[in-house]
Amino acid sequence: PAGTGTIGRVEQIGTPQEVYKHPANKFVAGFIGSPAMNFFEVTLEDGRLVGPNRDFSLQVPEGNLKRLREKGYEGNKLIFGIRPEDINAEAAFLETFPNSVVHAKISVSELLGAESHLYCQVGSSEFVARVDSRDYLETGAGIDLGFDLNKAHFFDPETEKTVY
């Protein structure tokens, strides 16, 4: 088992895979994984995650949406987390899930052999996507990226604990 914590406090104990896939809170989610998990402050509006200044809007899958509504987040703020590898540039994903696509500007592009890290911006929100090197684009380019919301994580903005 692995333990993750802050000074003087254990935040979560579990196998590395459990901690990675099911973090107990935002601290643990951001601590494990490289690049780190992306976090966005959003509002849940009519089944969509709406970013700051309405910079983006993503349709929440039905199962996730039901749980978020049951917990009282419809119309309220929450923190949406997604790992860089759960952001896709592949045409098949973009076509299959058009309601989870954002158009981003690449701030920094790192070609790392078989994969690329794209540091992107949508309005005031910044994030990193880990994509196949075939999807590499130069800094300054625009790119459509799809967020796999079936792998999304949600955190309460006050407690930073995982919502479910």
Language model regions located:
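Internal alpha/beta loop-helix hairpins
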Residues: 1-57
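Glycine-centered tight beta-turn/hairpin loop motif at sheet-sheet or coil-to-beta transitions
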Residues: 53-55, 122-125
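Conserved beta-strand residues within beta-sheet cores
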Residues: 25, 36-41, 84, 101-106, ...
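Short beta-strand micro-motifs in enzyme catalytic cores
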Residues: 38, 78-79, 116-118
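Short flexible coil/turn linkers enriched for glycine and charged/polar residues
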Residues: 34-36, 74, 112-114
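Short aromatic-glycine-enriched beta-strand elements
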Residues: 48, 113-119
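Glycine/charge-rich catalytic "coupling/switch" loops of P-loop NTPases
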Residues: 21, 48-106, 136-164
